[in-house]
């Protein structure tokens, strides 16, 4: 082959191939025709043209087994339907290595395409069947080992009779070439839940609603193959004749080294081979037409546009097959070249990663044009005319550019390169030519500098990407170590040392940031993983220690299988464990709080139940304000609600009972008012002889008594009964006072009797003297009269005895006193004085004795009344416990009054003890003035006391 023909005839440029990313495999933009008769190096590009790989494999190298996905990858299988799960189909074996003769790819393609056109695109040959045998016709009727069957639910599955395996996916043996292309496409069509189709890329994990262009091209190519018949036999023979002239020159370009030859027997006729070749050309032309219909660019030598009809290539191959009808002798290198002529080439110009070689050029099938034909087809010399000087100058510059005159060339060097061209004479003057040449040099130098700058920039970017993506590069890698590793590589030496250092520093910063981010992500991932493991470990509690947790983690299979988790930072693991323990402690505390709340709720419900139990007792009349715990304990203790109260903190059952009774007592004043209103409405008055049953009968006769407490009713009854008793005592006191007044009047009557009553007098003897007296009539009972008379006689006798004793003492004193007196005084006068003094003493003594007796009686009566008051106060305090506050105030007032009364009584007694001396009467008469005064004072005092008692009540 001539150098440069691949770039000039529409093949893929080498620079374009190098600009493509090497990481892409044949699965991105192209699909292998596996299962067909094409060689393993044949590929169909996205635009439908048959292309070949530039690298030539060794005849003995191992090719990928036929029927397998390129690059050792299996085709993406659709989601397995529900129901029967078929076994996975293992990779199928390739053809035997002894069956790799150097057969021309054109004959193989012709046989394959002829079979496809005649059989209406039947499925490709099953894997394991040699394509050379099929081309020779030795196994033309070979039966596939896969059979098609129907499942009970109507779905189709496929069974392998040799491996005894079944699969839902259609095997490559039964697929047509178009179906194989579609199956190798990474884009698959699926249905959403709503039935709308969408497309998913199994390699990039991308999904979209619109149909990808790659899938559309493959479907268009499938339709082209199915349609068929685009090239007729006449067109095919015309192409064969046109190729015969260049047959010899093509053969010379195959290989210069002699290799062993192999004879291939032909079992097909020339017409069959021609028809097969026509089918191949038709398929390629239709695919190219479909690709050109999708693009708007014109056919050029770039990657985006490919020649529409590569007839010279195909016709030459077909002509070779027709001429060598009986036997064909081909060298080993030519076999390898022809095996690679039908390689599927992607529009991006990707190079197969299996070979690892970067060829210098990418040639298409059109590179087989003979050199002689190319020289003959060169155009003859033309004559140029220029209308203006600018056009002539532009033509001269184009000449320099076409001849690729460098920017540093001298004028003499440039003349040698362009002087033979007619456009050299475009400018007549030499100065104009030199001027145009200098302008061309400036422009070319500028363009070269710009191109060098862009290439250098691209080299720096490539170097930066190389360092960033290299697996051995880290943020701690030294520059010297990197120079040792990459110093011999072109990407390292493509830039200067200064720029290399700057880029290296930037790469280290980028890698450091990247590593930090990765470490952060790894730390976060390990944190989450450890947290999940701790959450799922039931034996880790809030009281678990770190050492115990470590042992639990080592026994955990999830932790033991995760190497990254085992390499986790110990401090991070400890912090994660600490947070987990804190969460468990918080949960435990919350659980305790919930338990405490539940316990408190239970205790509260127990208290409420016991309160309801007390209400029930109150409704039945068993519990009232006067009830005691000891009385009701047998009844209360027999209830379960009392048992539930035992042992719980807070208020006990006794406390609740006391509170309940106190509440009932607090209602006493209000209920007492209601009771008084009821008694007032009924006109009932509580007397001393009123019974509690009568009182309750009167109270319960109205509806207002339903809310009254039985204890409060009893307390009200006791209060009213005490008031009735107080009234009765007051009445008795009043009668006693009246009786005392009558007695004092009777005694006065006896004292004032004339003649005076003697000490030895008898009541029956003197009774008749007082019958008509009012004092005698006031006392109706004779027995009382006798009693008063006896008392009077007893007092009279006592006074007489006291008087005689005083007279004796007085006589002795008077004698002594009489001796001291003056003798001038007469004896008669002294006698009169003595008698007069004696009378006075007798009166004073009788008066003082009566006063003492009366004061003693009054004091005794006062003490009795005071004792009675104290007893009544005690009774009131015992019975009227709710009125304790008011009673205390009343007691204070009464005490104050009593103290005042005591003071007044003491003053009166002191007055009685020292009475004024009065002018007396005769000693023989009764002196009753002193006794009368004492009785009056006593009477006044009694009246004041009675008035005070009435006021208090």
Swiss-Prot record:
There is a cross-link at residues 191, 241, 371-372 (Glycyl lysine isopeptide (Lys-Gly) (interchain with G-Cter in SUMO2)). Disulfide bonds: none annotated. It comes from the Eukaryota. Pfam families: FF, FF_PRPF40A, WW. One of its GO terms (biological process) is regulation of cytokinesis. Residues 140-173, 181-214 form the WW domain. The modification Phosphothreonine is found at residues 341, 369, 928. It is found in: Nucleus speckle; Nucleus matrix. Residues 1-40, 348-382, 799-953 are annotated as: Disordered. Residues 879-912 have a biased composition (Basic and acidic residues). Residues 389-443, 456-510, 523-583, 603-663, 668-723, 738-795 form the FF domain. Keywords: Acetylation, Isopeptide bond, Methylation, mRNA processing, mRNA splicing, Nucleus, Phosphoprotein, Repeat, Ubl conjugation. The modification Omega-N-methylarginine is found at residue 9. The WW domains are essential for localization to nuclear speckles. Interacts with the N-terminus of HTT and with the phosphorylated C-terminal domain of POLR2A. Interacts with AKAP8L, SF1, SRPK1, ENAH, ATBF1 and MECP2. Interacts through the WW domains with formin proline-rich regions and with WASL/N-WASP. Binds to WASL/N-WASP and suppresses its translocation from the nucleus to the cytoplasm, thereby inhibiting its cytoplasmic function. Plays a role in the regulation of cell morphology and cytoskeletal organization. Required in the control of cell shape and migration. May play a role in cytokinesis. May be involved in pre-mRNA splicing. Belongs to the PRPF40 family. This is Pre-mRNA-processing factor 40 homolog A.
